[in-house]
Each structure stands twice: as C-alpha cells, then as structure tokens.
Amino acid sequence: MTLILSKDRLAAYDSLEQYKENLKFISFITPKISNLEIYLRNALDYCLTQMKGSEWVFNENSLTPLIKELKEKKKEITHSLILSKMSLGAVINLIFCYKLEGVILDLRAYRFRAYYHENKDTLLIKGKKRLLYNYIKAHIALNLLWTIRNRAYHWENLLKIQPNNRPRIATPFSGKTENIPMDRILVIGIEPNKITLFLDDLIKSIENKDFEDLSSL
C-alpha cells in the first residue's frame, strides 16, 4: 500500500477505511465548495465593477502576476478569463482588502455555536460581551471556507480532530485588522460532522433556491 500512499499520508488516518470515508466525504462536499467559490468570485466582480468599473481586473495590483502568467501562455486576456483563473485565496483576500465581507454574505441568522459547542458568538471588549457583527461573522466564515477548501483539495483528513478533542478546522480572529480592541482572541472551529452543515448554511444565506439545488448534487 505504501507504493500508492506514503507512510505520512497513511499516518493521518486511523485506518484504511477512514481514508476511504474521507475521500467519499470530500467528493460529497466538493459541489458545495465549488459553487460557493463561483458565487464569491461573481459577487466580488459585481461589487468591484460597481466601485471601480469593469476594467478593475486589469488595474488590480494583486492580479498582475496572474495576468503575466496568462500572457506567457499566449492566451487572449479577457475580464472573464482573469476572473475564472483567480484562486479562492485571491478572491477572499480582495474581499478582505475592500471590506466587502458583510456585503457579500449575510450571516446574521446563523450562530457559530452550531458547529462546535465551545464556539462563542460574542466578543469580549473591555470586559463587556458584544454580539458579533455580520461583517466579523462573514470574515471568520470565509477563512473557515478557505481552510476547508484547501484541506479537501489536498486530500487531507477532514474527519480527524486534535488530540485535545478540539476541531482541526479552526480560525482565529483578533480584531486587529478591524481595529477592534478585543480582550482576547476569538477562535472558531468546526467539528468534522458539522462541516456539511456549515457549508449548507453559507449556501442558504445567499437565499437562491436554484443555487441550493445545484449545490446538493
């Protein structure tokens, strides 16, 4: 078996059966992740086109390396081509850069505690609890989606938890990027058996029945 799978890869699983279950799980959530990527890419394009005009993709400094790479392949450089070749990381970073989190996702009706019982849906600021603003929820959710996507597409074990029984899918939020004077860092995690729920909630938050149907293939 080590001729096919490395020892390091096998060591990440309790058994070969868990490896197979993980592959099945990744194949199940892939349509959800893919459709969320498409939505985020198009939503970003819509917002930045409204803000900066349709030429924004050609003028965005962070996309210069991608455009150069496409030119080297002698492809006809179009708006739609650049957009389609952007990685999820590039899309999310631009969403963060232009502070579009709360515009693109409305997560006010959703609670992070649903994905792990120790998650907090409040911030502690100068000793007082404050409910998470929507843009903070969206910021955290996008980081979690990015983590899930990267681990799934590198065939990492999404069914595994940490030795201390905390989720391996987790992201911190310190408030520094938003100039929020938090008393302590907030860490939000997703248990393996809640990953599907998390992705479904992101999809439902977009409030488009056709989009939901496409994501449940």
Segments from the language model and where they lie:
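Acidic/aromatic/glycine-rich contiguous surface patches that form carbohydrate-binding/processing clefts
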Residues: 155
